[in-house]
């Protein structure tokens, strides 16, 4: 659709704001549409790793009995993937209709000094679309942080969910784990229940303090309450509290806990959304999360994962133990504002062939030569191929039948590889 591509370009060209970031711009934008975000039920999900998986567990299960909006980022292939209802993307026609609806207001606000960024416009479209479509509930993933993320314009979600917290977006969200946690805690709202991934005592007290100050009941669980039954390269089996023989097709050791967090939320809302144990069991098992520890090809075996910070990298390395392979061939790239030294060091320990390539993000991506220098601090046998398609082609050429190709380091890289493999 011609207009769709034109408007996508128009959205991308809305430059990032200079100076202090506030919610004032999106507030002005949504006020012009009578604040649709405050007229729908919202489950708001923040955290460093596991947001996407947890959102998918929640939305997929709730959609068994209800009309459920899901907002996630980043998307893998097309911007419309960010806004879905019961798994169906907003159509290109509707997307264009909403941009044309918003455009005059945006242009007026631009002149008044309230310029909304691409992500703020996308967020505003999402809230208005979900309201117009009369969703029963919207599961909304925070873009970055919490306090000043554009999704946090919602005044009172029916629940706030916070997954794992680790050092990511340092300098933007904070320079310590406590500062980053406080930023995520910004989604805790007056009286709205908060569901928390297991935290150490120090961080738990921090979240409890914020929850108490907002009169928000806090629910969490101990990892000891999750009984691992079986792990494999295609499913995880576990018990969580009264929920026995649960299964998830999202693999990786961390998914036991993401799924348990989702189950805790779903159990709380059983009556509101007419759920029972069987529906929850089916919803958890049939959930999918593109680009996160996903086997996208069986011959040759290609595994993709968007891990780019310490905690996610540790989870990836631990999860690889359930995959059977002779040699591990790595296709890797990473943004220079991520913990690249740690990622290179840990991946180098387990990789037989280390191939590096580039990412389509000129401002934040490494130049190939600079990334090569970083890898060579750890190992000499690095293969540098600038073109991402050539890099994955080279990996498939050298891979034998029982080898595993791992593509990781950035969702930008994973996105391009998925697109290439699918088209091939």
Language model features with spans:
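Short functional linear segments
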Residues: 1-47, 54-64, 70-73, 107-114
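ATP-dependent carboxylate-amine ligase catalytic core
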Residues: 27-38, 64-155, 173
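Nucleotide phosphate-binding/pyrophosphate-handling subdomain across enzymes
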Residues: 39, 132, 137-142, 148-161, ...
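Beta-strand->loop->alpha-helix junctions that form or flank phosphate-binding loops
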Residues: 70-74, 197-198, 210-232, 248-253, ...
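Extended acidic/charged loop-beta regions that coordinate divalent cations
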Residues: 78, 122-172, 205-245
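Membrane-proximal helix-turn-helix segments that form the acceptor-binding/catalytic region
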Residues: 181-190
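C-terminal helical cap/extension that packs against the catalytic core
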Residues: 200-219, 234, 301-304, 310, ...
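Active-site-proximal loop/hinge segments that shape catalytic or ion-binding/gating pockets
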Residues: 410
């Amino acid at each position: 659709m011609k207009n769709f591509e034109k408007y996508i370009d128009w959205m991308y060209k809305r430059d990032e704001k200079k100076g202090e970031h506030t919610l004032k711009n999106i507030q002005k934008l949504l006020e012009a549409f009578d604040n649709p975000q405050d007229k729908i039920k919202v489950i708001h999900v923040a955290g460093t790793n596991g947001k996407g998986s947890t959102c998918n567990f929640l939305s997929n299960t709730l959609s068994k009995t209800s009309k459920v909006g899901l907002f996630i980022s980043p998307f893998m292939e097309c911007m419309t993937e960010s806004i879905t209802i019961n798994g169906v993307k907003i159509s290109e026609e509707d997307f264009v209709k909403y941009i044309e609806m918003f455009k005059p207001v945006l242009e007026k606000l631009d002149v008044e000094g309230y310029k909304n960024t691409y992500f703020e416009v996308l967020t505003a479209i999402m809230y208005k679309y979900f309201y117009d479509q009369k969703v029963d509930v919207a599961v909304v993933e925070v873009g970055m942080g919490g306090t000043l993320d554009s999704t946090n314009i919602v005044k009172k979600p029916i629940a706030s969910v916070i997954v794992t917290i680790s050092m990511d977006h340092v300098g933007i969200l904070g320079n310590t784990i406590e500062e980053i946690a406080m930023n995520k805690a910004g989604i805790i709202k007056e009286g709205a229940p908060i569901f928390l991934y297991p935290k150490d005592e120090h961080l738990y007290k921090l979240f409890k303090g914020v929850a108490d100050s907002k009169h928000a009941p806090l629910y969490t669980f101990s990892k000891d309450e999750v009984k691992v039954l079986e792990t494999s390269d295609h499913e995880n089996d576990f018990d969580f509290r009264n929920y026995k023989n649960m299964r998830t097709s999202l693999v990786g050791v961390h998914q036991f806990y993401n799924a348990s967090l989702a189950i805790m939320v779903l159990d709380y809302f059983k009556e509101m959304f007419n759920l029972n144990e069987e529906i929850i069991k089916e919803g958890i098992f049939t959930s999918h999360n593109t680009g996160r520890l996903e086997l996208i090809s069986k011959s040759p075996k290609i595994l993709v994962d968007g891990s780019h910070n310490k905690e996610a990298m540790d989870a990836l390395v631990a999860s690889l133990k359930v995959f059977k392979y002779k040699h591990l061939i790595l296709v890797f790239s990473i943004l220079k504002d991520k913990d690249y030294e740690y990622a290179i060091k840990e991946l180098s320990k387990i990789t037989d062939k280390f191939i590096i390539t580039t990412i389509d993000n000129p401002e934040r991506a490494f130049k190939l030569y600079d990334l090569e220098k970083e890898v060579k601090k750890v190992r000499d046998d690095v293969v540098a191929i600038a073109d991402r398609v050539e890099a994955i082609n080279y990996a498939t050429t050298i891979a034998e039948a029982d080898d595993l190709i791992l593509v990781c380091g950035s969702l930008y890289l994973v996105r391009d590889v998925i697109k290439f493999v699918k088209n091939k």
